[in-house]
Amino acid sequence: ATQVDTKLFSLGEGLQGGTVGGSGAAAWETAVIGSDGSTAYTGNSTNAADITDAGIRRMILTLDNADVPMDNRSLIMPPIAANDLLGINRFTEQQFIGSGDAIRTGKIGQIYGVDVFVTSNAPTPAGTDRAGMLLHKDALVLAEQVGVRSQTQYKQEYLGDLFTSDSIYGVAELRNDAGVAFVVPGS
């Protein structure tokens, strides 16, 4: 799972016309910072900023302007960004969201109709900064020829079991403008 996440996130670097596998100034050069969703991230002298309500709305607007469908959008973020969101009243308090589930359960659920997913597999573009993505399901694709296959075998010489898992898969970018990468500080 970590390897698949890493491959998909590496493609996220290329969203909005970015360079996949760039270094220095070319690393994540089309990513935006989390605070406003429009200022370009600079990897050389990091300007990453905490995710905000305005930043999320601006990234959604970027997808809207590219005629990306409203359904099947996902916000994928590192745990530090999820922690920042839980500190924003608009996303947690009952008067804003109705049920107040985010306070009770710690689960964010949806923001502006976008499903929120938290992963510790988010890459680090520079220093401790962490990357995330707001994207539509058509932005990136994962194709599996063979799903995860697990096997176990008893190894007498080690008096234990050998457990292996493998998969055959590939990833690709389908729609360049159907996603936006963003960067937040790692701490």
Where on the chain are the PLM-derived regions?
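Sequence/fold signature of self-assembling virion shell proteins
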Residues: 44-47, 88-187
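Generic, low-specificity signal for short hydrophobic/alpha-helical stretches with a mild N-terminal bias
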Residues: 41, 57, 64-67, 98, ...
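Long, contiguous amphipathic alpha-helices that act as assembly "spine/axial" helices in icosahedral shell
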Residues: 1-24, 66-79, 116, 148, ...
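Hydrophobic, aromatic-enriched interface-forming segments
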Residues: 49-88
